[in-house]
Amino acid sequence: MAAVSMSVALKQALWGRRAAAVGAVSVSKVPTRLLSTSTWRLAQDQTQDTQLIAVDEKLDITTLTGVPEEHIKTRKVRIFVPARNNMQSGVNNTKKWKMEFDTRERWENPLMGWSSTADPLSNLVLTFSTKEDAVAFAEKNGWSFDVEERKVPKPKSKSYGANFSWNKRTRVSTK
C-alpha cells in the first residue's frame, strides 16, 4: 500500500492533480510541492532548511563516537585565527576561528619509520565563524581551552609621492 501511495504522490508532484485523479488511490491529503526553480523560492527553501538546532543539555556521546574517554575528558584545545599566508596578499582564510587539539605522545613506527599516535583527535581542526561559538563548543564538550586573540595588523602609512622620490635606496649608488 505504501508503494502505491508513493507512486501516486510522485505522479501528483510531476503531473498535477489531474494525474492523481486518474490513479487508483485517492491522495487528497498528500500536500503538493511546487517544482519551481525560481531563485527566490530556492532561497526561501534554503533558509528554512538551515535553521540551527540548539541542544542545551550536555550529552554523553562517548559510546557513539568510539573515542576513548581519556581523549575526551582531559583535552586542552587552542582557539585562534590563523595568520595570513605570506606568499599571498589575500586575507580570505583569516576570518574564521579554528580550534585544534594539543599533541599527545607520538612514537616512530618500527616498520616504516612513520610517526604514529594513538590519539584520534590529534589531526582534527574545527572551524567556527565566531570566537564565542568556539568557546561554547569547547565548554559543552568539557575541554579546557586557550584563546589567542586576533592580531590586527596596523597599516603602514605611505604616501604616493614617496614612490618617485630621488633619494630612494633603489636609486642611490652603493659604490
From Swiss-Prot:
Record: transit peptide: 1-42
Q: Where are its TM segments located?
A: none
Could you tell me where this protein is found in the cell?
A: Mitochondrion inner membrane
Topological relation to the membrane, as annotated = Peripheral membrane protein
Indicate yes or no for the key word Acyltransferase.
Answer: no
Cite the entry's keywords alphabetically: Electron transport, Membrane, Mitochondrion, Mitochondrion inner membrane, Respiratory chain, Transit peptide, Transport
Segments of this protein annotated with the region Disordered: 150-175
Q: Which GO terms describe its biological process?
A: brain development; electron transport chain; mitochondrial respiratory chain complex I assembly; proton transmembrane transport; reactive oxygen species metabolic process; response to cAMP
Q: Which GO terms describe its cellular component?
A: mitochondrial inner membrane; respiratory chain complex I
The entry's family comment says:
Belongs to the complex I NDUFS4 subunit family.
What quaternary arrangement does the UniProt entry report? Complex I is composed of 45 different subunits. This is a component of the iron-sulfur (IP) fragment of the enzyme.
Q: What does this protein do?
A: Accessory subunit of the mitochondrial membrane respiratory chain NADH dehydrogenase (Complex I), that is believed not to be involved in catalysis. Complex I functions in the transfer of electrons from NADH to the respiratory chain. The immediate electron acceptor for the enzyme is believed to be ubiquinone.
Q: What is this protein called?
A: NADH dehydrogenase [ubiquinone] iron-sulfur protein 4, mitochondrial
- Give the organism the record lists: Gekko japonicus
